[in-house]
């Protein structure tokens, strides 16, 4: 999506605000994946794993991907939503659905 994590610890606060993810309430957790859409879509044909919610349409990436993990801070209250920004390289799990099987 053209967004890449910088050394800026405000990355999560900025991105979640810009993408209107904090309208009406603070979002507890969000993960931004910094890989091409094609690479993320490809996960739907990789390793099938159990979903946390019991569904059976989750897939894990074969290789680690660059992510930014955003978690609401304990003192954060709407409308002043604040998040902790953590960068990592991890295998991602996506739920895939539809005819073309998209994440």
UniProtKB/Swiss-Prot annotation:
InterPro entries xref list: RNaseA (IPR001427), RNaseA-like_dom_sf (IPR036816), RNaseA_AS (IPR023411), RNaseA_domain (IPR023412)
Protein's cellular compartments: Secreted
Binding annotation for substrate: 27-31, 52, 71
Pfam families hit by this protein: RnaseA
Cysteines paired by S-S bonds: 12-70, 26-81, 44-96, 51-58
Listed EC numbers: 4.6.1.18
Broadest EC class assigned to this enzyme: lyase
Annotated GO CC locations: extracellular region
Keyword Signal (UniProt): no
Assembly information from the UniProt record: Homodimer; disulfide-linked.
Record family assignment: Belongs to the pancreatic ribonuclease family.
Protein role: This enzyme hydrolyzes both single- and double-stranded RNA.
Protein's name according to its UniProt entry: Seminal ribonuclease
Organism classification: Eukaryota, Metazoa, Chordata, Craniata, Vertebrata
Gene that specifies this protein: SRN
């Amino acid at each position: 999506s053209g967004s890449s994590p910088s050394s800026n610890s405000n990355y999560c606060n900025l991105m979640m605000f810009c993408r209107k993810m904090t309208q009406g309430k603070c979002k507890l957790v969000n993960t931004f994946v910094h890989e091409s859409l094609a690479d993320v879509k490809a996960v739907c044909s990789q390793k099938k794993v159990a979903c946390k919610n019991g569904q059976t349409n989750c897939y894990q990436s074969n290789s680690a991907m660059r992510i930014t993990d955003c978690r609401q801070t304990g003192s954060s209250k709407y409308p002043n939503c604040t998040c902790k920004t953590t960068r990592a390289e991890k295998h991602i799990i996506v739920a895939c659905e539809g005819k073309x099987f998209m994440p």
